[in-house]
Amino acid sequence: MSEQPAVAAGQAVLVTGAGSGIGLATVQALLQAGHPVYAAARRPTHLQMLQDLGAHALPLDVRDADQVQAAAQHLQHQGLGLWGLVHNAGVGGLGVLTSWSDTDLHDLFNTNVYGPHRLTRALLPLLLAARGRVVCIGSQGGSITSPFMGPYTMSKHALEAYAACLLQELTPHGVAVSIVQPGAVATDIGDNGRVANVARLQSTAAPFDAAAAAVLQVLHEAPALQSDLPESNSNRRYASPQAVAQVVMQALFDPSPQARYLVGTRWEGDRVVQALTQRLLDAARSPSHQWTEEEFLAHCRRAWRDA
C-alpha cells in the first residue's frame, strides 16, 4: 500500500471485516459522516481500496492473537482514542451438523466468537477511557436455527450471549453494547466459503444425502425472487448492506442505543418473534413452572410496559 492518510481527530471507530458487505458499507457511512475510521481487513486488495476511500487501513485477522495485539498497540500510538468497535468479521458455513469436523467447527468459532473476544479484550482500555460503544454484527440466526445451518447459528447464539454479558459488565463503566441482527443480506459471506460448503454437501452420507442434494441445487440454481408471492424460506427478500450500516450508525451514535436491533423484512421479524415466543412457552410449561395462560400473558404485558 502507499502511505496511509492521517487519522483525523474525533470519534474514531474500528470496523472489522471492512473489505466488503456490511463492513464496507459501515466504513463508507462513517467516512461520509466525518468520522475517522480504522478499517480492518485481511486481503491486500481490500486494504488498498479502503485506504483509497480515506480510511486508515489496518491489516488484521481476528484469529491471530499477535495481529490483534499489534493493532491495539497501533491505536494506542495514534493517540486518538477509540469511540466505537464494530465486530463485523465473520464466516458462514453449510452442512448437516454431524458432517462438520472438529477442526472446521473450531475455525468457524475462531472467527465468529473468539475473534470478537480477543479484540474487545485488547481494546478495552481505549473503550473504557472513551466511554464508547461496542457493536456486534450478529444474525437472526442468533435467535433461531434451521437445518444445515447448525454451526453458523451456534456461533451466532454464542455471540448473542457474549454481547449480553458484555452489556451487563460494561454498562456500569459507561460503555454501551449492542448487537445487530440482520436477516438475509446481499453480501458475499456465502461465496467466501462456497467451495467448502459444496464439498461438505456433496460428501453427505445417508440418511441426509437427499436433503443435502436439494440444498446443493439451490446453491447452483438460486431461484429468482417472485415479488408477487409471499416471502418464505425459498422466496427471500435481501436487505442491502447499506440498510444494515445505517442501523450500525444508530447503535454507535444514538444517545441511548438499544441492546438489540433486528434488521430485515416483516416476515423475518415475525419468524424470530414466533421462535422466541415458543421458547418462552416451553419454559413456562416446564414441570417446575406450569404457568397458566393468564400468568404467561400477564408476564408478557408487564414486560411490554416496562420495556
Regions found by a protein language model. Give the residues of each.
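SDR active-site lid
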Residues: 172-257
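Substrate-binding pocket helix/loop in short-chain dehydrogenase/reductase
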Residues: 96-97, 104-106
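Active-site loop-to-helix junction immediately N-terminal to the catalytic Tyr of the SDR YXXXK motif
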Residues: 100, 145-153, 165
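Rossmann-fold cofactor-recognition segment
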Residues: 53-66
